[in-house]
Amino acid sequence: MLAQREVVALVHDAVNLEGIAFTFPEIQTLLDGVTVGGHKLSDQQIAINQAKAWKQLFSDLKQNNFVLTAEYACKLHSIAAKEDALEWGKFRTSGVTIAGTEYLPPAADRLAQLFAEMVDRVTMQNDIYDQAISLFLQMARTQFFYDVNKRMGRFMMNGHLLNQGYPVINLPAARQLEFNQLMLDFYQTGEEEQMK
């Protein structure tokens, strides 16, 4: 699986999209088990969690254990969001907001149903890339978790692609400003076309 060789790039871009400024060599060093000076421990933990979540995803894909379910998303979230989110490994239990937009994600008591509906809608689309991108977007917009929603959307999107024999989609950190603006517009409208 080619994506396994790209873990450093995937982690680098993911943390930088979250506003955590690590260079590529710093991520390489950190993932080799050496701490990097000048960074908060919490930021380093986020990067390490990303790498661990990728390893788990690759392992699950090899063993045919990747599934588009709420349970699987929560399992992966327990790794990706450990000590980063208010709670990890389960859907949020109260309301959240998204900075920069007036859009309010759905109430917490609807999340399990919304996840199942999202998977049904996504898998009805013909194009595998449209399915994957829609999965990412809807996970980010619905905010199933207190935090780490976009990262989880990327994991589930890429797990779905890899499971179908397609390469991953990596969102380059160099396009952070454009990505953030498009996401804010998407949160407000729910219209996916601009993002595909």
What spans do the regions from the language model cover?
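FIC/Doc superfamily catalytic core
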Residues: 1-196
